[in-house]
Amino acid sequence: MSNQVIVTNISPEVTEKQISDFFSFCGKVSNISTEKSGETQTAKIQFERPSATKTALLLQDALLGQNKIQITSEDGGAASTTDQGGAGGDQAARQEDKPRSAIISELLSRGYHLSDVTLEKSIQLDQSYGVSSKFKGILESALSGVRSVNERYHVTEKANEVDNKFAISDKLNRTSSLVSTYFHKALETAAGTSAGQKVQNAYEDGKNQLLGIHNEARRLADAKNQAEGTASPASSTPTAPAEKEPTAPTTESKTTE
């Protein structure tokens, strides 16, 4: 599969940077070009890794500006579901290595509007193939940045609990987070349909691990911000993800109808 996707039906007011920021959640963008196509825009986006391309293909019907975008791979192929995020176990974890549900959650937390189909597919893929071992390295990377303030914030003790508690029942108490709220809203919307049942089954099986990742990552990031005196309110403008540092939802988002 090509590392390039073609995105059509983009609202004319959307800038190239905004397009790049949006697709950077999928992985590193190596090149982007746009051109006018009637009353809309078409963009060609080249990713560094194939796994980012496959994640991008999940974002069909997402809103960029006022329009629902359409996404195809350069070779016209459909998204593959056979990879778990990138090869090369000795390389540092990247955005592409995150579970696709985590990437979708990040997009929602930044104010982007995604379809329920995108949510369903991301959960199903993560349920089928699990969480990349390299993604767990992201938590360790975040931890390394706050070890200098460990005595004050006891961050290490908290972080060391992560691997052992992903599947423990007390993680269910964290379902008041945005991720859980959004998932439940989506499930309610799809209630009574076969698709809704599939999403619910996949979600119920996998939510402990996903919520554990998000909440522990958020706690580490917050502790780091407090220690460095850099904590600030979440921006209302969607922005690209910071490299190598996990983020979790902090503002309310909703799905498209």
From Swiss-Prot:
Compositional bias ranges of the Low complexity kind: 75-84, 230-257
Signal peptide: none
One MF annotation (Gene Ontology) recorded for this entry: RNA binding
UniProt keywords, alphabetically: Phosphoprotein, RNA-binding
Keyword Phosphoprotein applies: yes
Keyword Ribosomal protein in record: no
CDD domains cross-referenced by the UniProt entry: RRM_Vip1
Phosphoserine carried by residues: 132, 177, 232, 235
Record-listed Phosphothreonine modification sites: 230
RRM domain ranges (all copies): 3-76
Gene Ontology CC: one annotated term: cytosol
Annotated region (Disordered), positions in chain: 74-99, 217-257
Entry protein name: Protein vip1
Organism encoding this protein: Schizosaccharomyces pombe (strain 972 / ATCC 24843) (Fission yeast)
